[in-house]
Amino acid sequence: MKSPDVSLIVNTFQKPRHLALVLASIAIQTGVDGRFELVVADDGSDDVTRRLVTDFARGVPFPVTFTTEPHEGFRLARVRNRGAALAGGDTLLFLDGDSVLPPDHVATHLAARRPGWARIGDVVRLPESVSRDLVPDGLAAIDLQRLAPRSEWQRLRRRHRKSLLQNLLRHPSKPRLAGGNFAVWRHDYLRVNGSDERFRGWGQEDDDLGLRLRGAGIRLASILDRTCTYHVWHPSDPSATPRWRDGVNVPYFLRRGRLTRCRRGLLPRGRNDILWGLPADRTTALSALLAACLVDAPGAEIDQPCEIDVVVWPGKDRFRRRAECRLLLVEEGAREECPSTIRRRADRIESLAGDDENGLLALLEEVG
């Protein structure tokens, strides 16, 4: 059977009423007959959600897949990856299970596809009063555009105009990716190993994915001049914070040495899956232990780029390779002797004893 052009991946958790509205809006998409499939990726809801999706699947002409696993807190990155792993479309259109699609939404995203680009959108936030009155059977007859606050349309227009300027100036981190409405080529999502599952709790997994897509050479363009989705009101997630800098994931997000292909994504990447830049000087106990721990890992030549470049102090090596992460290993007691020129170039500095094999192995499995 021919693969679909696009896989709609809808994440959800314990919001069956909202999900029913989203499913109803997907059922009335126009201009895309036979071109899409739906994957509902659930984060451990009760059986009401499973029954809702099962009943919905019986009445629609497109494939519907449901996946779930036990709930262990807010794990949006993991849920999206589980959905992506089951998707067969050339394009992955990620959607939130609380945001209703306009009838031409999927067709608009398909028409906007370009190699090397991801299309990013946003939501119009519907007021509680409007959200409360929405019912699945009545969506086709409702003009959500008219019911949305004018201030929301003004906000989206400003965001779109800013995104055009940011792309023109080749801004390194903007426009930002909003995970509830974005489309990416499947092979590009695979290139960065999907979403980073080390983000647990609310926030920053979208920003991280956007940065890593850019690191892989993929550009992000706004689609807000063509389409958006409509967010149905609900109370905020308990792990959300009023200020993003107070979020539980912020320290991890702001770390230096981010790898384009994350270590805990669609596939786990152990130390033997990373391209390392290893020191040539192996005369110290710590440098010899490092070589032994990475004996089966791929290594880059001194003039080749790598993912993680490692310098051991004391030692004769310096950071010379082009690398995404620079790791400085300092033997215990020698940190003060390490030149500041080496320390400044390092993204991460760790002090270890020359015989601490367990500590070094643990570090090599998670750095980056």
Say what each PLM segment does.
Residues 176-177, 181-193, 200-219, 224-225:
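A short, conserved alpha-helix in the catalytic core of glycosyltransferases
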Residues 42-51, 99, 333-334:
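A conserved acidic beta->alpha catalytic loop
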Residues 34-47, 65-69:
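Short beta-strand/loop segment that forms part of the nucleotide-sugar
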Residues 70-87:
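Glycine-rich, basic loop-to-helix element that forms the pyrophosphate-binding segment
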